[in-house]
Every structure is written in C-alpha cells, then in structure tokens.
Amino acid sequence: DHIAGHHEFDERLVHPAEAEILAAPDGANTLATDFVGDDMFEAHPDCPLCYAEYRVRAAPATRLIEDGDVLDLGNRVLQVLHTPGHSPGGISLWEARTQTLFSGDILYDGPLIEDAYHSNLEDYAHSLARLRELPVRTVHGGHFASFSGQRMRELIDAWFDAHRLT
C-alpha cells in the first residue's frame, strides 16, 4: 500500500503478504488504476509525466518482516505488529517505551478504507481488537493528524458499534 516511491529506497521492508506487489506492481494491485488520474499530474505542471505514462516501478523487498519482529533504530525500538484488514500485509509499529503506535492504514482519525479489493472485515476486526489492548498514549496514523490513546479506543469502539461486531 502506498508504494509509488518505494524504488527510491535502498531498503524496502514488507510483510510477505504484499511482497509480490513490490516485485511486480501493476495498476490493479497498487490501486493506481482507480486512484491516479491526470488531475494529480496537472497540479504539478513541471512534471513531464501524464497519467497514461505513469507506472509504479518494480523494486522487490530487501527484507521480509513478520509479526513480532523488532526494528532497532538505535534511539528507537519498534515492534512489528501484523495488522491486516485494510490490506493483507498491513503492519503497525509499536514503541513500548513511549507507548507510541504508528498504525499505518488500519486506523487513523478519518474515514477508514475497508472496502478495497484486498480488504477483509474479519481481519480488520481482529487487528483493531488487538490494537485496543495496547497501552497506547499516542497514535500516528497513515493519514490525518495524530491522536491520543483514548481517542484510539473511541475510534475502535465506534468502528465495532458501526459494524455490530464485538
């Protein structure tokens, strides 16, 4: 998910469930067919591309990451949480020391995309229930502004209420 610039990075970590997309992206599996249009390019007139020429470049993962893996960045240690639902290889990153959650696309304070071709509501529910149990203080979602752990629990409870799942 959100991989249009992944080829720019020397290191590309991904969950195995989405590794093939990085290696062989196309308009369907990247959602570019549905979400990328000429208006995006017209907003940047210096850009020499147009929609008809746009392609997400292939660049395979350099490392596969699984639930429970630890990413030690020196001053920050993040635990990988596999949080499928929005997409099958969705991950969140949990920093226990600061009680900070980088939730990606599974949760943010705005309309959640849960009906893409690769979304799965049962997985979504399981992932949200798992996140709700964490002692989160701050959430940095994949979209919109960051929010508190209390707001996270409110958003998750509202999602379950709206879907009548418990």
What are these regions (language model features)?
Residues 56-57, 70, 77-163:
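Metallo-beta-lactamase
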